[in-house]
């Protein structure tokens, strides 16, 4: 029993590489990760519902992105819509988890996979932003005007949607990676 206490107090004596930083970093990271996760869930449920199923009644960006009853409306629209809208946030969280896993190995292939994940996520956010911006455009369209990618790219709403999703997704992935790394350091010796 004395040996176990000694190992915990001086792990380097026994050849164990243990970080003695306080557990506070883990708990601070976790306390940041939880609300960011909730935000991502709300954002992607709302944005995906708005992009694929919502009929617009306003040109407000907030109303376009954040549909307060998106999940409830998707459920009432049908089980397929509910499953689609309800599971999209987990796709992004899964991609964030893969970011963490690919960062563990420092190989060229891992960096290529990381780049591919960022591009994939960014492209999906572009699709969501494009579809939402198109619905806003169609709502306020003047007869004879047609929506195009160049109109979307010039729209502040388009970029606002991308950054509200993609930038927060990147932050979530980095915080998640930090929390997972700190969790490994909390107690290497049990």
Residue locations for each model-derived region?
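Long, non-membrane, amphipathic alpha-helices that form coiled-coils
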Residues: 1-27, 179-190
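Hydrophobic alpha-helical transmembrane segments of integral membrane proteins
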Residues: 19-183
């Amino acid at each position: 029993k004395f040996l176990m206490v000694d190992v915990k107090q001086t792990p380097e004596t026994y050849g164990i590489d243990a970080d003695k930083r306080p557990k506070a970093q883990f708990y601070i990271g976790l306390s940041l990760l939880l609300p960011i996760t909730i935000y991502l869930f709300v954002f992607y449920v709302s944005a995906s519902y708005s992009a694929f199923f919502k009929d617009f009644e306003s040109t407000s960006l907030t109303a376009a992105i954040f549909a307060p009853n998106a999940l409830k409306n998707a459920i009432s629209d049908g089980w397929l819509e509910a499953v689609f809208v309800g599971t999209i946030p987990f796709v992004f969280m899964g991609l964030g988890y893969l970011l963490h896993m690919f960062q563990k190995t420092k190989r060229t292939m891992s960096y290529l996979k990381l780049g591919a994940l960022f591009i994939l996520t960014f492209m999906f956010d572009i699709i969501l932003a494009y579809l939402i911006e198109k619905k806003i455009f169609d709502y306020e369209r003047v007869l004879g005007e047609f929506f195009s990618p160049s109109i979307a790219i010039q729209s502040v709403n388009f970029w606002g949607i991308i950054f509200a999703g993609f930038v927060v997704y990147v932050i979530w992935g980095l915080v998640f990676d930090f929390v997972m790394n700190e969790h490994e350091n909390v107690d290497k010796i049990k």
